[in-house]
Curated annotation (Swiss-Prot):
Keywords attached to this entry: Membrane, Mitochondrion, Mitochondrion inner membrane, Repeat, Transmembrane, Transmembrane helix, Transport
InterPro entries documented for this protein: Mit_carrier, Mitochondrial_sb/sol_carrier, Mt_carrier_dom_sf
UniProt repeat feature Solcar, residue ranges: 11-111, 124-210, 231-328
Name of the protein this chain belongs to: Mitochondrial thiamine diphosphate carrier 2
GO molecular function: thiamine pyrophosphate transmembrane transporter activity; thiamine transmembrane transporter activity
Transmembrane segments: 11-27, 88-105, 127-150, 182-199, 230-246, 303-322
Species, as recorded: Zea mays (Maize)
Taxon lineage: Eukaryota, Viridiplantae, Streptophyta, Embryophyta, Tracheophyta
Keyword Ribosomal protein: no
Keyword Nucleotide-binding tagged: no
GO cellular component: mitochondrial inner membrane; mitochondrion
Annotated GO biological process: thiamine pyrophosphate transmembrane transport
Length: 336
């Protein structure tokens, strides 16, 4: 590698990191209310639908029984700040997560394509896009995981709070689980993130290529003027929206298992239902079997609706913001 290429690659990595961090922060803050509701559903052992009210003799009373009911309950009991509970560790997690993810992704695509230009990366095979996305997701997860754990713990509690702030949750985890407790649930998280990140980035590239093909066809066959395959902001939004929906729907059961491992054995106010005791789940496969046995197959899809309502726009906002911020910073820094 020539010495002239190194500063350029360093600038490119800085652009990717900064654009990824900013886009991740915007996306996470905008969609935090839906993320809080999703997490409350995922860690609730009792049914999360109105059907649970009719079967409370079997399962016990359910705290949350639907998206609208949960929204009203959180607003009444915790006020508007309740919808941003855990947002500080979420930002501390998601900003470095997206920074690492987009930086590693660009590096992998540059290596695979032999070019650092983004437009050349679209010519990679779908298989390489999926693999690059999965590897980038793994690197980002390992680098930011303790904040993901703290986000889940703070977002899952309501009022009265068990942990008043991030520091108290951190201290209690160290005290009860040791330093390794900060990585509780990392294995199922990696099992989840490999297909999730692979599908998210792979499908985004696939949708974007399809959109460019449609644009070329539209301009050449439908008399729209000169040929142009550039993708508009709205089309980028649609690609991100579709990628977010597809990847989240496919991997949601693994996300439920991950959340259960993260709060296993931690304190929980009785108002929010049964506590998940330590060593309830002996492994990922055992957790899947236990959830199905005790909660039915629907237990694996708790929080799916708020998750999809959140993930689709979150994916769209992240990708669109990244594309534009990356282009803007790159133009200022003289990076292609």
């Amino acid at each position: 590698m020539g010495s002239g290429e190194e500063p350029s690659q360093m600038r490119r990595a800085l652009v990717d990191s900064l654009a990824g961090a900013i886009s991740g922060g915007i996306s996470r803050t905008v969609t935090s209310p839906l993320d809080v509701i999703k997490i409350r559903f995922q860690v609730q052992l009792e049914p999360t639908t109105s059907w649970g009210i009719l079967r409370r003799d079997i399962y016990g009373p359910s705290k949350y029984t639907g998206l609208l009911q949960a929204t009203k309950d959180i607003l009444r009991e915790e006020g508007l700040p309740g919808f941003w509970r855990g947002n500080v560790p979420a930002l501390l997690m998601y900003m470095p997560y997206t920074a690492i993810q987009f930086t590693v992704l660009h590096k992998l695509k540059t290596f695979a394509s032999g070019s650092s230009k983004t437009e050349d990366h679209l010519h990679l095979s779908p298989y390489l896009s999926y693999v690059s996305g999965a590897l980038a997701g793994c690197a980002a997860t390992i680098g930011s995981y303790p904040f993901d754990l703290l986000r889940t713990i703070l977002a899952s509690q309501g009022e009265p709070k068990i942990y008043p702030n991030m520091r108290s949750a951190f201290v209690d985890i160290i005290k009860t689980r040791g330093v390794q407790g900060l990585y509780s649930g990392l294995s199922p998280t990696l099992v989840e993130i490999i297909p999730y990140a692979g599908l998210q980035f792979g499908s985004y590239d696939t949708f974007k290529r399809s959109m460019m093909t449609w644009n070329r066809y539209k301009y050449s066959h439908l008399n729209f003027g000169s040929e142009d395959d550039s993708v508009s902001s709205f089309q980028l939004f649609l690609c991100g929206f579709a990628a977010g929906t597809f990847s989240k729907a496919a991997c949601h059961p693994l996300d439920v298992v991950k959340k259960r491992f993260q709060i296993e054995g931690l304190k929980r106010h009785p108002r929010y239902g049964a506590r998940i005791e330590s060593s309830t789940y002996k492994g990922m496969y055992h957790a899947l079997k236990e959830i199905v046995a005790k909660e039915g197959f629907g237990g694996l899809y708790k929080g799916l609706f708020p998750s999809l309502v959140k993930s689709a726009p979150a994916g769209a906002v992240t990708f669109v913001a990244y594309e534009y911020i990356s282009d803007w910073i790159g133009s200022k820094a003289g990076v292609e």
